[in-house]
């Protein structure tokens, strides 16, 4: 059967400059012809720096953005970042000493950081790591992640979405998806054609009597959910496909049209948990959010090796939209600084 999504992998050349060290558990976002990179770890649980790195797609060189304004003080891992307009939004993360960061923006025109929200205060979002983040034109969304504890009684992982209204500068929690919804970290999280999709991720069992894949209450999930802001309703989505991805977390993902595109990820955690590499994938899959059918994609000979705990985003390079992947953890448990782009050539 002919594949409905065609594309090709390319390795993005990096010619030098102030190049970020290899890392995982960091955040990236693209504004115009610039890629921004923040946070990360190497080795496990060792945060690296608090510099904001800038990659120029025209010169293929790196630089460090000016550190003006309310610069985040903590060197963080397990953080996430998105772009809306000309601003970056960075949420959460922590260092080895369990010092957690808050919510900031960075104006790429003024080249200035701005403190936005103190996390862990009553009535607002709680501090966290290994969460997921996405955005639309008016909102920044944060899903899941691992709890610090904070002032509110909270499970070890979250199952709710926090929505930040950019114009109003206010947070609101979207409707709770219910007890059957898994609490997850490192899940896929995207806005696709106006709806919020949560898929796969590392989950905590709701019922302690339920046996899990690892003999504990933590496991890789394969469930897919969708939230419609128009109706304020959650739906668990039953997907199909001859080549359907196995359970996983910590994978790269992007939205292109009606498609959710994923790559790699952790398909089995390491016996030493985050200290080890686990079993990592180099498979690529695409979900048609209209037909709800998964299919595998290959993308030619230039394909990333097995990896997880990457940073990823949707962007356009050379006129083609696709999935950009930076850094991550390899099967050797080493971190990488490689950058790859899966360019979508056609989709039906």
UniProtKB/Swiss-Prot annotation:
Effect of substituting residue 157 to A: Reduced ability to form allylthiocyanate. Strongly reduced ability to form allylthiocyanate
Cited Gene3D superfamilies: Kelch-type beta propeller (2.120.10.80)
Effect of residue 270 to A/N: Lost activity
InterPro entries, A to Z: Kelch-typ_b-propeller
Transmembrane regions: none
Impact upon substituting residue 274 to C/G/E: Lost activity
GO process annotations (BP): glucosinolate metabolic process; nitrile biosynthetic process
Gene Ontology molecular function terms on file: enzyme regulator activity; identical protein binding; lyase activity; metal ion binding; protein homodimerization activity
Enzyme Commission identifier(s): 4.8.1.8
Positions annotated as active site in the UniProt record: 94, 157, 220
Signal peptide: none
Assembly behavior: Homodimer.
Function: Specifier protein that contributes to constitutive and herbivore-induced simple nitrile formation. Catalyzes allylthiocyanate and corresponding epithionitrile formation from allylglucosinolate in the presence of myrosinase. Also converts aliphatic glucosinolates, such as indol-3-ylmethylglucosinolate, 4-methylsulfinylbutylglucosinolate, 4-methylthiobutyl- and benzylisothiocyanate, to simple nitriles.
Other remarks in the entry: Does not contain the mannose-binding lectin domain present in other members of the family.
Protein name: N-(sulfonatooxy)prop-2-enimidothioate sulfolyase
Organism of provenance: Thlaspi arvense (Field penny-cress)
Lineage: Eukaryota, Viridiplantae, Streptophyta, Embryophyta, Tracheophyta
